[in-house]
């Protein structure tokens, strides 16, 4: 836990201790004890509990319960953490507790409730926490009635708007609104700057902006913690920041600040200075290294230059964490050697003009972490004769042009984490590496290694939990994995033979990725208990094991591009956590798996290039299920039938759009040791906009559909226009008839549209010319007629996108439309009516068959997607919350 979080927790507890004399009662028994709650209060509390699902509540949690005033019996404090699931309604019994002084409801699931204005009635509140509880929309202005508040925590919700609700909250000492969507300009006259008693202010991860950090922050001179990380502030940090003489922690990272480093020399109590990821320039003042309590400096990823000077007096410095990577610093190594108390040192990507000798760090006897990635390392200092601190636990030497395995690692018996990716290391992994007693994580991807010294059992007794060996030249049989293995990835190597059955005995294995190798044989049935199984692009045969039992934890399953046959296992329906399913490019012969609609979290379904057959429309001819599905790729099968107009109405997740930075990624995160954890992201290979590309981090706020190369017929469903998150649509090479739906003009995010090789008729809707993101469009080889719309995005398409339609005319085709002076073709009546209605499509209209007889054609990109899931692995050290995002990610 970070110092700032510890401080916040301490402050909340301190404020809670100020509540009047009271008695505490458990969640289930508010009536027990000598000072029991009044009968009306008991009734209100019981009603409040009954408004929610409380099955997740930990009734043994000593902090969950009710405090009642000993003299009046009134509820004065209520804390229910991670207990409640449901909607917090304005008529909730909660608002009957008018004597509440402390209300703590963090980590509940209020299912996207808005914060009720009724909170303003609880005007005796001194402490209020609603963090991590799913609240959305704006904070009601009635919050300004809570004039007694000393602490307010609204962090980690989906709240929007400004901070106008803090007006009149003049007693506030703690304000945390981090991890929301608050926005707007922080003006000098903002109510925020009237909160002169604030000692803790956290605005992290919002979208506040200002041409510079307001000078008025300097008026909050009681502040001890100030955090404005990851907003949209730019310009220079005002000199008034030096007025905050009580400040102990200052967080300004991930903004667009410029100019010199802020003046912090007067902040003699400062212990943490975090300025990562800005555009600060100039030199680093030597005074930073003599500040009496400063223990952590994060200046990485800026534009700092020059050398640094470390006074001799710095040997007594408390500095433990120094991050200077990705700057333009010159002579810094010898001065840094004076900072003998350093525990973490980042000097990555400094572009030094001379090689770095690791022995320069020999004086740093307490060093635990060293990152020299992207630097030029002296070859001699990597030998066994070199000396570097034996205390090292984490060593990163990526992108260092190293060609031999560093023997100096032999002496590092405390080493837990090694990163040597993107070098030129060849030969075999040395046998001694796996004998390092504390080695837990090894990342040696993108090298030239060919195998392992020793027998096939060489890894078995290693302590390694995380092993990533992607993109080497490893060949032969896969060695037996460590007994402690949690994550193993060997993507893009030359391993062959059967997948060893010894993997079945690795009970802690969560993630196995053997994609892009030469494995053959069958998939071992025992792999059904993994969280992530990736076997893409091998030579595996047989059927997929039908061994998935109830509550199987599987989240991602990819066996695409193999030689698998048989049917899709019905037991997959037991995988309630499944998000990503890919069996594309195999020989699976089955009907469409409608039963998978029961999987509540399924977001990606890839079935292309198999032998799926039969109707794609559900047996009842109603809408297709899959409310969370965003990517559906079933191209190149033998699916038949027509699709009803309301086919896509249940795709709720794809009907909403969000800004890219607010999207959710296909991601898995797991603590691996101590304060370290790994994060895995999905990536996919697309043929997109006519080009092959890799999309890293599958953003599930976007949607793509590819139904091409089947035998589908009838009209294109009007309900496609509901899928506002759709960026790519491919319906080519089918037998669709009728007109292109006008509703496609509602797809404002669409980038790629392919309707080629169908039997579509009518004109191309003019509305498609207004789609500003449409970069690729193909409607060739249909029966379209009339003039091609002249919108910018359409006229930029090649002639081949419109060929094969005898009745089409206009640019970019050579055929003119009835002569240069002839009037344009008359619009169909339905298109005129749709334009009058501004082409708005709603759910009700689709459900009753909106636009009966409104048939116009459709168009989408070549999303013949060959999905190549890989893992992007980033190690993050979360000693404070910011390190969760900055620690080792560049």
Swiss-Prot record:
SUPFAM superfamilies linked to this entry: L domain-like
Gene deletion effect: Impaired perception of fungal endopolygalacturonases (e.g. BcPG3) leading to absence of necrosis upon B.cinerea BcPG3, BcPG2, BcPG4, and BcPG6 or A.niger AnPGB treatments.
Location within or outside the cell: Cell membrane
Biological processes per GO annotation: defense response; regulation of defense response to fungus; regulation of defense response to oomycetes; response to molecule of fungal origin
Leader sequence residues: 1-21
Gene Ontology, cellular component aspect: plasma membrane
Entry-linked SMART domains: LRR_SD22, LRR_TYP
Function recorded in the entry: Recognizes fungal (e.g. B.cinerea and A.niger) endopolygalacturonases (PGs, e.g. BcPG3, BcPG2, BcPG4, BcPG6 and AnPGB) and acts as a microbe-associated molecular pattern (MAMP) receptor to mediate defense response against fungi (e.g. B.cinerea) and oomycetes (e.g. H.arabidopsidis). Functionality seems to depend on the presence of the receptor kinase SOBIR1 as an adapter protein.
Protein name, UniProt field: Receptor-like protein 42
Lineage of origin: Eukaryota, Viridiplantae, Streptophyta, Embryophyta, Tracheophyta
């Amino acid at each position: 836990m970070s110092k700032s979080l510890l401080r916040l927790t301490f402050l909340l507890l301190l404020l809670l201790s100020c509540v009047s004399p009271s008695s505490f009662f458990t969640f289930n028994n508010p009536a027990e004890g000598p000072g029991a709650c009044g009968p009306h209060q008991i009734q209100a509390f019981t009603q409040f509990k009954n408004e929610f699902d409380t099955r997740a509540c930990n009734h043994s949690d000593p902090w969950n319960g009710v405090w009642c005033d000993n003299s009046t019996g009134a509820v004065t404090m209520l804390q229910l953490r991670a207990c409640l699931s449901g909607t917090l309604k304005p008529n909730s019994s909660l608002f009957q507790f008018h004597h509440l002084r402390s209300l703590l409801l963090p980590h509940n699931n209020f299912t996207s409730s808005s914060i009720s204005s009724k909170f303003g009635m609880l005007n005796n509140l001194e402490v209020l926490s609603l963090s991590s509880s799913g609240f959305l929309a704006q904070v009601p202005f009635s919050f300004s009635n809570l004039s007694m508040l000393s602490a307010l925590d609204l962090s980690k919700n989906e709240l929007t708007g400004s901070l106008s609700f803090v007006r009149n909250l003049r007693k506030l000492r703690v304000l945390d609104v981090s991890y929301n969507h608050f926005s707007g300009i922080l003006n000098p006259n903002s109510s925020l700057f009237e909160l002169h008693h604030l000692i803790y202010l956290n605005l992290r991860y919002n979208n506040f902006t200002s041409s510079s950090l307001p000078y008025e922050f300097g008026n909050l001179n009681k502040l001890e913690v100030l955090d404005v990380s990851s907003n949209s502030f730019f310009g220079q940090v005002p000199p008034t920041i030096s007025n905050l003489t009580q400040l102990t922690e200052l967080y300004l990272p991930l903004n667009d600040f410029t100019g010199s480093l802020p003046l912090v020399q007067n902040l003699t109590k400062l212990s943490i200075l975090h300025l990562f990821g800005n555009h600060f320039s100039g030199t680093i003042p030597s005074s930073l290294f003599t500040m009496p309590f400063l223990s952590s400096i994060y200046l990485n990823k800026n534009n700092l230059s020059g050398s640094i000077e470390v006074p001799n007096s710095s040997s007594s410095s408390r500095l433990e964490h120094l991050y200077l990577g990705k700057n333009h610093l010159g002579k810094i190594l010898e001065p840094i050697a004076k900072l003998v108390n350093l525990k973490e040192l980042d000097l990555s990507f400094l572009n030094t003009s001379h090689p770095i000798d690791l022995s320069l760090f020999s004086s740093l006897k307490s060093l635990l972490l060293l990152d020299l990635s992207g630097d030029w390392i002296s070859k001699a200092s990597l030998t066994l004769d070199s000396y570097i601190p034996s205390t090292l636990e984490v060593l990163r030497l990526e992108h260092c042009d190293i060609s031999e395995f560093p023997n100096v690692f032999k002496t590092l018996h405390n080493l837990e984490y090694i990163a040597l990716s993107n070098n030129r290391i060849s030969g075999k992994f040395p046998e001694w590496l796996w004998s390092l007693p504390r080695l837990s994580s090894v990342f040696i991807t993108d090298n030239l290694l060919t195998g392992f010294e020793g027998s096939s059992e060489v890894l078995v007794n290693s302590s390694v939990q995380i092993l990533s060996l992607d993109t080497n030249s490893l060949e032969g049989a896969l060695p037996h994995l460590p007994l402690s293995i949690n994550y193993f990835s060997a993507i893009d190597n030359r391993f062959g033979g059967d997948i060893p059955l010894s993997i079945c005995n690795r009970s802690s294995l969560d993630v196995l990725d053997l994609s892009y190798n030469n494995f053959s044989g069958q998939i071992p049935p025992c792999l059904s208990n993994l969280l992530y199984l990736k076997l893409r692009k091998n030579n595996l045969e047989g059927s997929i094991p039908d061994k998935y039992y109830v509550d199987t934890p599987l989240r991602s399953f990819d066996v695409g591009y193999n030689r698998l046959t048989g049917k899709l296992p019905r037991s997959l329906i037991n995988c309630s956590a499944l998000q990503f399913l890919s069996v594309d490019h195999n020989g699976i012969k089955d009907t469409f798996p409608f039963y998978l609609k029961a999987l509540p979290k399924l977001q990606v379904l890839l079935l292309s290039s198999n032998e799926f057959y039969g109707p794609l429309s559900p047996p009842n001819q109603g809408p297709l299920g899959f409310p969370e599905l965003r990517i559906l790729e079933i191209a190149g099968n033998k699916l038949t039938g027509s699709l009803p107009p309301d086919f896509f109405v249940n795709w709720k997740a794809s009907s909403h759009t969000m800004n890219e930075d607010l999207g959710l990624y296909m991601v898995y995160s797991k603590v691996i040791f101590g304060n370290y954890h790994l994060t895995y992201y999905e990536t996919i290979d697309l043929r997109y906009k006519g080009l092959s590309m890799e999309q890293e981090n599958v953003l599930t706020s976007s949607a793509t559909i590819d139904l091409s190369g089947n035998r589908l017929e009838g009209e294109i469903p009007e309900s496609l226009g509901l899928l506002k998150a759709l960026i790519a649509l491919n319906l080519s090479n089918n037998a669709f008839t009728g007109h292109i739906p006008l509703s496609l003009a509602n797809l404002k995010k669409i980038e790629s549209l392919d309707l080629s090789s169908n039997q579509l008729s009518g004109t191309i809707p003019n509305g498609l010319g207004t789609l500003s993101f449409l970069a690729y469009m193909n409607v060739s080889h249909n029966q379209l007629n009339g003039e091609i719309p002249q919108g910018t995005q359409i006229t930029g398409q090649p002639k081949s996108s419109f060929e094969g339609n005898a009745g089409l005319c206009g640019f970019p085709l050579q055929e003119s439309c009835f002569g240069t002076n002839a009037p344009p073709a008359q619009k169909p009546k339905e298109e005129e009516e749709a334009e009058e209605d501004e082409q708005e499509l709603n759910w009700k209209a689709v459900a009753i068959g909106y636009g009966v007889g409104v048939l116009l054609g459709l168009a989408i990109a070549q999303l013949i997607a060959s999905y190549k899931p890989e893992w992007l692995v980033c190690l993050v050290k979360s000693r404070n919350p910011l390190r969760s995002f900055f620690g080792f990610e560049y």
